[in-house]
Amino acid sequence: MACRTRFAPSPTGYLHIGGARTALYCWLEARRRGGQFVLRIEDTDRQRSTQAAIDAILEAMQWLGLGYDEGPIYQTQRVARYQEVAEQLLAQGKAYYAYETREELDAMREAAMAKQEKPRYDGAAREQNLPYRDDPNRVIRFKNPIGGTVVFDDLIKGRIEIANSELDDMVIFRPDGLPTYNFAVVVDDWDMGITEVIRGDDHINNTPRQINIYAALGAPVPKFAHMPMILDEQGTKLSKRTGAADVMQYKDAGYLPHALINYLARLGWSHGDQELFTPQELLDLFDVKDVNSKAARLDMAKLGWVNQHYLKTDDPASIAPQLEYQLAKLGVDLAAGPAAADVVVALRERVHTLKEMAEKAVVWYQPLETYDAAAVMKHLKLGAEVPLGKARELLAAVDQWSVDSVSAALHDAAAALELGMGKVAQPLRVAITGTQVSPDISQTVYLAGREGALKRIDAALTKIGAA
């Protein structure tokens, strides 16, 4: 049977980093085996599900490059199908109506706890064969097997056994006429032919219940792979503050989508000591059975390292649109400065994110209005007008403005004055950027443009003259 996996988020919020890893592993497993990847939106929680959250999930999937073969399929559009299957179970005596009030259910739980037993439904209506009636407390409960054990071999966790005596008769249809999670996902996965269910290990306790429903329906049981959670850098549960952010916040923070994909792939899975993978290598090497059963820790420094690798090695033209996105967020007029691809070349060895790159690049897009006082005192003092003036003269005469032609002009200026290159470069660097730190001086001047560079040199000469 062809592999079919699914990613099934609930649209009650954004797609966080743990959900993105789940989607990636489902996508990789399907792609590696030549199967299909299905996107299902589990939106039966009508109070908390929102269209904004759905849109955010779809946007994040697109940004990450996790295309799906089917979907998005919405559970709210399948309610009639869930009712059909529930009625089938009722007709076969595998489910039943129950009408207990909230107070009665609370009393059951309190009685169980008083006996130091697990709070649960006591099966009061199990054998009463109650008919349907219009009642605000009406639910449909599944007749869980009383004896025996549920056994399944998890692809990550290994063999898991749960005694049926640990499970009660769970509700499969609520009073509001909607199915519960454990029932809907079984019907969905059955109808959609899902062969591997890859999800977080917070769902392990749901699995025995779901397997019993599969058995009652005579449906094939998929294989299960329960991934351990992602912890923060301190080894505690992720929070918004420690990394469990909206995937699109990683975009806003300046990470490349394929860098995040590479990092997420390694967050729980490995292939020897290899850290960096091309997309094809991930498709060739990934196997969900190789996912570690222990929780992984988020390491933002490692993510930054991976991101910097791709900033250094990707085609600058492919990075440019994402840098332009960051510059636009800073209110920069892109037409007022250099081509973004040229900025990438100049800065990519110096930053870990595109956000850092954009912040450093602003100096070439906006008028230089402030100077570092220490830099001015050290490099724009009396005497600096000589190398600055010579550099200006030769830069003004450059025919074709390029990094190479700028470099030649600056070296000629140093040679003409019999100065070391640093004596020309440092005052020029302060004149162009207002600071003592910048990329290679030829790139720094080139990115300012001929007109911009000459104007900034003139301003520096004026500053020296006024000192």
From Swiss-Prot:
MF GO annotations: ATP binding; glutamate-tRNA ligase activity; tRNA binding; zinc ion binding
Binding annotation for ATP: K240
Motif 'KMSKS' region location, chain numbering: 237-241
Enzyme Commission no: 6.1.1.17
Cystine pairs: none
Top-level taxonomic group: Bacteria
Transmembrane parts of this sequence: none
Localization per Swiss-Prot or TrEMBL: Cytoplasm
Main location: cytoplasm
Family membership noted in the UniProt record: Belongs to the class-I aminoacyl-tRNA synthetase family. Glutamate--tRNA ligase type 1 subfamily.
Functional summary from the UniProt entry: Catalyzes the attachment of glutamate to tRNA(Glu) in a two-step reaction: glutamate is first activated by ATP to form Glu-AMP and then transferred to the acceptor end of tRNA(Glu).
Protein name: Glutamate--tRNA ligase
